[in-house]
Amino acid sequence: STNRNNLIEIRSWTEIQEKKLNLTEDEEMFRVAVIQLHLEYWKKYENVLKEIKICDPACGSGAFLNQCFDYLHEEMNFVLEMKHLYAEGQLNLFDIDKQILQNNLFGVDINPESVEITKLSLWLKTAKKNQTLASLDDNIKCGNSIVADSNVAGEYAFNWKEEFPQVFANGGFDIIV
C-alpha cells in the first residue's frame, strides 16, 4: 500500500515539476515514452493476473480461496487505477469478480457440503444487486484430490486432467494453496 501511495505521489510530483518547466519537444517526447513504458508494464501485469491459476485441492469452506480472491481483486483494482492514471483517459472497468471466480480460482474437496460452502462463501463475497451469480461448477468440484482410481475412491475418484482440461491444456496450475 505504501508503494502504491509512493507511485501516486511520484506521478503528482512529476506533474507539478513539468508545469514549472517549459518542456522542449524532446523532453515531451521522452515524457510520453516513459508513460508508454509504464502503461505497457501495467498491461503485462494485468495479463499475468488474469491468467494465473490457483488451486486449493482440499478447499473445505473456502478460506484460502477467499484470501486468494481478496488478493487478486486488490491487485486488479490497483492495476486498473494505474492504467487509468497513466492513460489519463476513462477508467476501463470490467467485472473483476467474475474474471477471478471463473478464470483464476479452482478448488476440490471430498465433502460435497464443503464444496457448496466454498461456492456460497465466494458468492456472498461477490454478490451484486440485479446481477446473476458467476457459475462455479466448472471451478469448484467434489472429489478425492489424491485418488483417481474409482476402484479405490469410488464415486469420489478425481482425474485432474479430465476435471480441469482448460487448465491442464495450458500447463496446469500456477499456485497450489
Regions found by a protein language model. Name each.
Residues 1-177:
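SAM-dependent methyltransferase catalytic region
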